[in-house]
Amino acid sequence: MINPWSSSDFFDYERLKKEFGISDQSDNIDHFLFRRKVILGQRGFEYIKYAIDNKIKFNVMTGLMPSGEMHLGNKSAIDQVIYFQKLGGSVSIAVADLESYSTRGIPLDKAREIAIEKYILNYIAMGLQPCEIYFQSKNKDVQFLSYILGNWTNMNELKALYGFTDSNDILHINAPLIQAADVLHTQLNNYGGPAPTVVPVGFDQDPHIRLMRDLAKRMRIFNVFYDGGITVSIKGKGDSTMPVDQAYEYLSKRFSEVTKDYEYRVVKAKDGKEEDIVRTDIDLAKIGSEFNVFSFIPPSATYQKLMKGLKGGKMSSSVPDSLISMNDDVEEAKRKIMRALTGGRDTEEEQRKLGGEPEKCPVFDLYNYEIDDDKYVNEVFEECKSGKRMCGYCKREIADKMSIFLKDIKEKREIAREKLSLYIHE
């Protein structure tokens, strides 16, 4: 079982993908985090690819937990958000102040301060364009939808997903429903209606993704799947034929071998192909939204590998010396890097003879996650493996590069402060 609130160890990613049905990531996404397999898995990403290729509306959703520092380990989610925004994605960002209160006891006013000073200013400084940033405690649509979602799940499911026990307080138990509402509310009709939605996450957040995808499927009228042709299953009572007729009318415009069955509430297009599923599902979700306000397309997700902390384990706010904060002073960041663990050998002689182990090295992770020049990063990797590159030189080099980055972000944060009203809507 994965605990999305306190995972501290690295995962066997391939085992996790196999166990929970997470698919391999697409190879044709032109971003260095995807090319290097830092983004290692996905659910439903074919919907996002379809939206990008066909220039139709899609949403990009992420959230921030206002409980500590924004650091390089969670920066890559915003790197993805900015990338998808440039491709046409409509961005929404939730400040999880209710969740931080329920799970970590952080007062709402303190959560607001942390969110703005530690996160949002950095997002803008990184290049995020104006979008919708909101606080859970202020968003009535999210609160209302989380209440409704409670009618579509039960304690047995939440216990199985999260390991909740009778001692967990209700606010904590409700936190996953609030998070699901964060993602799904962007598809309500007053936000533009059903649309493919991508959520960049770490593997530790998969329980949330599974829950919200299941909820989206349960709440829909039309569910589409492939079984040698396209089949549409329609929820409702047998005497309600209108949705069946609508699905039949839609499929008949696109396919020639279409049948409908009122008794079993099924419409089939025998000549429909598997590659037709995504478009069909999107179109029927939009049709369904005309008489079902909860006609959600199950959200897609990208899954990234955890970044190594400078002192081992994953980079986390709970170990300050193990992270590079976006708000770190340049000299402080340099100090942390120079004291970091490495994948190097015990002596310089052994390093030259045996070569280093960059795949185990927190310092190399700084190159891999932060430097977008593929050729250069590959050269660093090969020089380390061959024994040509020494750890001291590597630390000094990346420390200088991180210093330039942090100085630039610091300057842009002050400019960003003047633009906050373009992002935070209350």
UniProtKB/Swiss-Prot annotation:
GO molecular function: ATP binding; tryptophan-tRNA ligase activity
Catalytic activity from the UniProt record: tRNA(Trp) + L-tryptophan + ATP = L-tryptophyl-tRNA(Trp) + AMP + diphosphate + H(+)
UniProtKB keywords: Aminoacyl-tRNA synthetase, ATP-binding, Cytoplasm, Ligase, Nucleotide-binding, Protein biosynthesis
Motif ('KMSKS' region): 314-318
Subcellular location: Cytoplasm
UniProt record, GO biological process: tryptophanyl-tRNA aminoacylation
Name this polypeptide is given: Tryptophan--tRNA ligase
The species this protein was found in: Thermoplasma volcanium (strain ATCC 51530 / DSM 4299 / JCM 9571 / NBRC 15438 / GSS1)
Gene that produces this protein: trpS
